[in-house]
Amino acid sequence: MAAGPRTSVLLAFGLLCLPWPQDVGAFPAMPLSSLFANAVLRAQHLHQLAADTYKEFERAYIPEGQRYSIQNAQAAFCFSETIPAPTGKDEAQQRSDMELLRFSLLLIQSWLGPVQLLSRVFTNSLVFGTSDRVYEKLRDLEEGIQALMRELEDGSPRAGQILKQTYDKFDTNLRSDDALLKNYGLLSCFKKDLHKAETYLRVMKCRRFVESSCAF
């Protein structure tokens, strides 16, 4: 009998709850396919969380008539644009797994500081009650990417810190128009960067483990 939606949800939840292996030489070792599955699920969850947060913040604070012009002004705002990383799936497929993991790690680490104030921006719980857990979720994904890097270590030189700048922290003064625009821009970059990290992880998973979900 084919697995139903409930089975799929339970499986996904189970994978999200699995801990990352702290020692790759420990027994029993987690299969590489499971490491990738865990990382992809976590990245998808964070990307969706970021997209939902952006939309709800926009709906609550940004007048509809101003959204398009503000979004255009945000086009070159993200510091992550200074990273020579692939901009989409096709470009990502031209890079090695280790390169994609390093880019993913840089993107995740650039947000560890800024998101620590994210829960204060959403004191009224605009879209989700777990905004105070975003930092922990990012650290969890960081740990998963590092576990994959240990597994796939190929002896190539480690990349230095490419990101020269990082993001400002979210502003909790929501009575200021400047603060609102700053937070709106940060949420836009957060969404874009997590989409990149998710894309890189999915490309790696798909080319190592051919599956029907590779079409994305």
UniProtKB/Swiss-Prot annotation:
UniProt KW keywords: Disulfide bond, Hormone, Metal-binding, Phosphoprotein, Secreted, Signal, Zinc
What does the entry list as the binding residues for Zn(2+)?
A: H45, E198
Q: Which InterPro entries match?
A: 4_helix_cytokine-like_core (IPR009079), Somatotropin (IPR034975), Somatotropin/Prolactin (IPR001400), Somatotropin_CS (IPR018116)
- Specify the domain of life of the species encoding this protein: Eukaryota
Q: Which GO terms describe its molecular function?
A: growth factor activity; growth hormone receptor binding; hormone activity; metal ion binding
Pfam families from the entry? Hormone_1
- The main place the protein resides is secreted
Give the GO cellular component terms, alphabetically.
Answer: extracellular space
Signal sequence, start to end:
1-26
Keyword Protein biosynthesis in the entry? The reply is no
In its UniProt entry, what is this protein called? Somatotropin
Record organism: Equus caballus
Encoding gene (name): GH1
